[in-house]
UniProtKB/Swiss-Prot annotation:
Residues 194-196, 240-243 are annotated as: Histone H3K4me3 N-terminus binding. GO terms for biological process: transcription initiation-coupled chromatin remodeling. PROSITE patterns: SGF29_C. It comes from Gallus gallus (Chicken). It is found in: Nucleus. This is SAGA-associated factor 29. The gene is SGF29. The record marks 238, 245 as: Histone H3K4me3 binding. Gene3D superfamilies: 2.30.30.140.
């Protein structure tokens, strides 16, 4: 029943999103006439080689209108982004509900483990579709935007992806990509599933062994302070794996769609680090350990 309700709400939100996008285009078309007038006014001023009081007053009015038009379009786009965020949240809730129903249903046969190639593709898609933080002028990037840490009292929700420190079969500890199943406030412990095992291996971990992944990408052009900087020590997901390893930032992203360039610690190289490898913002988190000597 909950799944049907979610589907109905998603359909409503998609219709609202389509309406908002239509309004965006209308707003843009309406403001285009004003922008053309600004351009023509500047051309006339260049032809006459003077800035008369008339042109100064006219331009002031045109720019005031252009600013108001841009703000109106911006407000519509922000509403559209809110709808997209709500749709993604509902899709995630539906996925978790379906997963729980699958776990506790005896009527259906157990699902097969996901093929590794499919899993890697899903992880790449998750990184690509991570929303970009777009704040209003003067807004500071929130916790879990890029390199910004979670608030001290933050508790990851079921379904959230995290870096989790677990004991491997050989007894060594490693950081893995995991999904939160639950959190016990009484015990201050998480239950997480290893992503690579499709829920077959579950770990109970203290909060200090769990690092929430970013929920927004930071925009290097507007919020560079929300990115890890060159030579900063991090934990990064090694490409084509589901494990996090210590690495140094070689270069932060330059554009919103860019990845980090990182140097993984690797004793097989003379300087102790691998050649630069690209890792998405989604899979780079702070490392609390000290840099190796």
């Amino acid at each position: 029943m909950a799944l049907v309700s979610a589907d109905s709400r998603i359909a409503e939100l998609l219709a609202e999103l389509q309406r908002l996008l239509g309004h965006t285009q209308e707003e843009r078309s309406r403001s285009e006439h004003n922008l053309i007038n600004i351009q023509k006014t500047h051309e006339r001023m260049q032809t006459e080689n003077k800035i008369s009081p008339y042109y100064r007053t006219k331009l002031r009015g045109l720019y005031t209108t252009a600013k108001a038009d841009a703000e109106a379009e911006c407000n519509i786009l922000r509403k559209a982004l809110d709808k997209i965020a709500e749709i993604k949240s509902l899709l995630e809730e539906r996925r978790i509900a379906a997963k729980i129903a699958g776990i506790y249903s005896d009527a259906e046969p157990p699902r097969k483990t996901m093929r590794r190639g499919v899993l890697m593709t899903l992880l790449q898609q998750s990184a690509m579709t991570l929303p970009l933080w777009i704040g209003k002028p003067g807004d500071k990037p929130p916790p879990l935007c890029g390199a910004m840490p979670a608030a001290g009292d933050y508790v990851a929700k079921p379904g959230d992806k995290v870096a989790a420190r677990v004991k491997a079969v050989d007894g060594d500890e490693q950081w893995i990509l995991a999904e939160v199943v639950s959190y016990s406030h009484a015990a201050n412990k998480y239950e997480v599933d290893d992503i690579d095992e499709e829920g077959k291996e579950r770990h109970t971990l203290s909060r200090r062994r769990v690092i929430p992944l970013p929920q927004w990408k930071a925009n290097p052009e507007t919020d560079p302070e929300a990115l890890f900087q060159r030579e900063q020590l991090v934990l990064a997901l090694y490409p084509q794996t589901t494990c996090f390893y210590r690495a140094l930032i070689h270069a932060p992203p330059q554009r919103p769609q860019d990845d980090y360039s990182v140097l993984f610690e690797d004793t097989s190289y003379a300087d102790g680090y691998s050649p630069p490898l690209n890792v998405a913002q989604r899979y780079v988190v702070a490392c609390k350990e000290t840099k190796k000597k």
